[in-house]
Amino acid sequence: MVAPKWVFISFMILLSLAICSGQPVTSDAIKAKEADHDNLKAHTLSNIDAKGFGGGGGFGIGGGWAGGGGGGGDGGGSDTPNYGYNPGCSIHGCTVPGFGFLPKPVFGVPVYSPGCGYVCPADIPTGGMTESKITGISQSARLYRCKPGPNMCDSKDCNELLLHFVFPMQDKHDNKQEHLRYGGRRGIGLTVGGVGGFGIGFGAWGGGGGGGGGGSDAPGCSNDGCDPGFGCPPGCGYACPANNPSGGITEFHISGLSRFDGPYRCRPDMCESEDCNELLLHFVSPMQHKHENRHDHIVERSDEEEAHHQSKQHKDEDIIN
């Protein structure tokens, strides 16, 4: 009698599962699937070198349908299981360090960790609106888009990427088109701070906001002659705004913008207007970066020795007089 009873119970369980699996797909399920699709298309400014944030720092991502908040992480990248790592990126279909393609992408698009911001790498010719703001690179915390085109130069190994900063009205228009397509409301807040960390918050429906512990927005630095790194929070990294023609090596690395994890320098304005909103990032090879750092140290040491010599000479003259 016991065996038939368990057979009957097993049969009822299987029947219930069959009935549940045969239920029609509701509109809510379709919307949820579209939202998941949207999330899977997202990219991230991942694997940021924590040493560039003042020897400490952290990286945190928060996600959720009602809104997310990023907290201080442990200083690493947002590596997620089942998301690949491919350092090459010189062939078609390749991605960038910190990102990954699944062997057979579910939706025929690159698959990234859900809830991240959108950026287009230098060697992928697709343009698009970003979902995050980078403070300290443009003269204001505006959204940016990557300009279409495989590279800014002819070589497939080119390490230049043009960022175009978008005005709020244009951003509003593009977001409206995106809302009509997917429904709902999205948002990402990005804050780069000093020792506190780096955080991203993401919300698919309720908007997003985030920030690492102790982080604060870098100032605009849009005044003429402004030092791009001047007045920024300690350890926020060096970046030159779009309307400042001075270049320089950054103090931190951004993976996801170039195909290798290297420091970048800003190039002079891409247009003549002082209100130009385009910025060309040129990614520097590690050897070049090392050489220029060594050269800068030699120049600084020489300046210090010269200043010390002049000071000593003035003191000797004062004693003689």
From Swiss-Prot:
Tissue specificity: Anther specific (tapetal cells).
Region: Disordered, residue numbers: 301-321
Descriptive protein name: Anther-specific protein TA-29
Organism ancestry: Eukaryota, Viridiplantae, Streptophyta, Embryophyta, Tracheophyta
Gene transcribed to yield this protein: TA-29
